[in-house]
Amino acid sequence: SAGNVRRKRKEQTMHRIAKFHFVSPGQFLTAMQEGYPQYTEAQIKEMYENLKLPRRATKGSAGYDFFAPFAFTLAPGETIKIPTGIRAEMKEDWVLQIYPRSGLGFKYRLQMNNTVGIIDSDYFFSDNEGHIFMKITNDSNEGKTVEVPAGTGFAQGIFMQYGITEDDDAEGIRNGGFGSTTK
């Protein structure tokens, strides 16, 4: 049918520019112990074994859903920093933009603390293995508490291509983790 032909053409024109990976068990353990000392090493190991790589829900989805490595609850005004256990390898002229899942943003005003998370292509090679962290806040002005069970999608990442200026002369090389390029 004509619909199948259009879908097939669209699939052929989609750019395959990235791949998700898990960080090492040691990196996940370190991140979890720093932020969540209440969890035992055995509990963190179990969380790591249950991590899911981000994936699109449908063929038409632009966003790759990121899944909560552990259950969390956010009352209005509360913030949490989540080590996802995920890293993203992508072509040089692409960026991964991170947003809350639409439903959580709409129902609870769940927001990224930096509005949009930006994962640069060279972050993959940083000292922390390019471990993607997400800091989110329940900005509800209706008194709504959000509960996210472990393994549930809570954020989404969208790959976007970008350009540079004709006279760009950036030569720096990333070696640190989050926020290291501003030091």
Question: What are these language model-derived features?
Answer:
Residues 3-183:
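Non-catalytic terminal segments and appended small domains
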